[in-house]
Amino acid sequence: MKEVNNKDFVITVVGVGYVGQPLINEFAKAKKVFAYDIDNEKIQALGNNNKNGNIVYTNNSECIGESDAVIVAVPTPIYDNNKPNLEFVINACKTIGHNLRKNTLIVFESSYYPGVTEDICIPLLEENSSLKNNIDFFVGYSPERINPSDKIHTINTITKVISAQNNFVLDQVERL
């Protein structure tokens, strides 16, 4: 896995919403960032107004294969019965898996219940990529803590909770 501190380290953020966009803006201060979303109108509008040369707004999932890290920041809405809707996370994992290359770091920012990463996300990534977790690609988790209306506790001031499958990956997630 390429070190996060490498100047050529490329990041894709999957999901350009209230969680993804602040991450994109922060990462783009020092890295090339692909901002990937399936909403064509959103991508076109953001791309037309983009003045940061480090950000590429796209709906082409092939950008994932050009990335050293993929940050998953898709929504996890709640059904009327208070159960989480994991459809966006599942679809993101399939898309990432289809485009995943070896030695990629994947960090899940989407909020969901314990066990989803291990029981749903990793198997989908392996199935759709034919790669093996913790050998060919690496996974971390850092639940989003962004409250869009809070101007005091912003992405730059909140303490992030992070986890990973081993100390090396944890170190890379922390540097990210």
Region annotations inferred by a language model:
Residues M1-N49, V56-G65:
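NAD(P)+-binding Rossmann beta1-loop-alpha1 motif at the extreme N-terminus of oxidoreductases
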Residues V74-T76, S111, N166:
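Short glycine-/small-residue-rich Rossmann-like dinucleotide-binding loops
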Residues G65-E66, K102, T157:
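Alpha-helix C-terminal capping/helix-to-coil transition sites in glycosyltransferase folds
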Residues I78-R145:
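Rossmann-like NAD(P)(H) cofactor-binding subdomain of soluble oxidoreductases
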Residues N50-V56, N133-F137:
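A short helix-to-beta-strand connector/capping loop
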Residues V70-I71:
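N-terminal Rossmann-like NAD(P) cofactor-binding module of classical short-chain dehydrogenase/reductase
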Residues E26-K29, N48-K51, P84-F88, I120-P123, ...:
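Short, glycine/charged-enriched secondary-structure capping and boundary segments
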Residues V4-K7, P123-G140, I146-L176:
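Internal alpha-helical scaffold of NAD(P)-dependent oxidoreductase catalytic cores
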